[in-house]
């Protein structure tokens, strides 16, 4: 559940406990999904959970892979990243190892310049892979300017959501001074948000929910 979408665990559980009517047959996964989504009270995380389960079941029943269902070529697909969750600094090496199959790593920062640099340096001590950074709305303008310049030197590809979603003024200012592209996350909840952030960010993080 996401607070950004006004969802809570309790609100999700209330819908599930009230009961979801499942169609008897799944001749079409899209129509099957729509029948279930109509009962989800617009709770996007719940819709995504059902969508994943439905597509997985459909592909297994029809003995095809997910990329075959979407008629997609894995070889030409954009490269995705593996997110490293930083808790214990002593476990960074283990976290980096977990992301071995991925060519790109993503790390959440926004804990202050000193801590953020410490985390990136630690990751760099284990790998030279491309890193993507999510500042998680944790910086101010001065920090953003310093960090973006420093992160460029560390082989970082882009910075996601450097400031609070309400702080578009500083985001626009940082974009002028940052050597790295800025990607919107909390500022792009739905497609209707895009006109407001056009020219402020270089791209958006599209959530499949």
Each language-model region and where it sits:
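N-terminal capping/lid subdomain adjacent to the active-site entrance of alpha/beta enzymes
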Residues: 1-131, 138, 142-145, 149-153
């Amino acid at each position: 559940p996401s607070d950004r979408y006004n969802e809570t665990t309790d609100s999700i559980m209330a819908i599930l406990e009230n009961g979801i009517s499942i169609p008897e047959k799944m001749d079409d996964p899209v129509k099957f999904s729509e029948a279930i989504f109509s009962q989800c009270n617009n709770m996007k995380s719940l819709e995504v959970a059902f969508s994943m389960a439905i597509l997985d079941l459909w592909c297994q029943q029809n003995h095809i892979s997910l990329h075959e269902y979407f008629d997609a070529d894995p070889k030409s697909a954009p490269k995705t990243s593996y997110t490293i969750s930083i808790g214990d600094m002593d476990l960074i090496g283990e976290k980096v190892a977990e992301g071995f199959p991925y060519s790109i790593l993503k790390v959440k920062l926004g804990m202050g310049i000193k801590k953020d640099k410490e985390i990136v340096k630690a990751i760099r001590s284990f790998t030279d892979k491309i890193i993507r950074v999510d500042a998680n709305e944790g910086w101010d303008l001065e920090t953003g300017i310093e960090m973006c310049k420093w992160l460029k030197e560390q082989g970082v590809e882009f910075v996601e959501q450097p400031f609070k979603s309400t702080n578009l003024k500083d985001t626009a200012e940082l974009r002028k001074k940052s050597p790295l592209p800025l990607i919107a996350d909390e500022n792009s909840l739905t497609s209707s948000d895009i006109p407001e952030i056009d020219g402020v960010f270089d791209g958006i993080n599209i959530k499949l929910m």
